[in-house]
Amino acid sequence: ETVTLNNGVKMPLIGYGTYQTPPRITERCVSDALHIGYRSIDTAQCYGNEREVGLACQKSSIPREELFITTKLWGCHKYADTLRSIDASLRRLNLGYIDLLLIHEPSGDVHEIYRAMETAYRDRKLRAIGVSNFMPERYLDLINHSKVVPAINQVETHVFRQQRELRRLECQIGTKHESWSPLACGQNGIFKNPELSRIAASHGRSISQVALRFLVQQGIIVI
């Protein structure tokens, strides 16, 4: 199942994340994920495993156009160094283009960083651009200083942290919401929660399935 971003690009509703996956096992993990049906793979510059993600995708028999690769910028401050950073990710992934590029967090001169992303987007190096960990105030500030509306805002979102205000804003403006840590990092007693346990039992499902369904049923993309 896919969702359509604000520029018409289709993105899988569920993706495989590589956070805290050491480079030495990333290629195997991503290959396994692709083998069982994942087509959306999420990485980041600060994860240190872009190259291995790219290798797994290259070695698979899956056509490039069926894959959706997300990565995130880290440590950029100005326009020029952001352009260089984008090109470095393109080289490491070695997949021709990046499907979705995000600002990993609202630090540095986000207006200059995003302006460079808009340039790379116009140059067709990127199919879509967006942000990550932008709360309402920072999100609205970026919107007011950009030409391209972010396609995605990837934020910690789960049954215990639903981000309702942020999601309302994004819906009004045209940005899709994406969840990282959809199972709350296993915290807050999620796997023993009485209400989730009751719902899971009544539907013959696991708590994990219920927690994920809670998100995807609302059109929230899940990593």
Model region roles, listed by residue range:
Residues 40, 97-100, 128, 152:
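Residues at the N-termini of beta-strands
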Residues 64-77, 99-106, 133:
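A short, structured active-site edge motif that brings together acidic residues
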Residues 82-103, 119-123:
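CE4/NodB-like, metal-dependent polysaccharide N-deacetylase domain
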Residues 105-223:
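Beta/alpha (TIM)-barrel catalytic core signal, keyed to glycine-rich beta->alpha loops juxtaposed to Asp/Glu
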Residues 21-34, 77-93, 112, 137-140, ...:
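Short, acidic/polar
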Residues 21-24, 42-52, 75-80, 106-111, ...:
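Acidic-and-aromatic substrate-binding clefts and catalytic sites of carbohydrate-active enzymes
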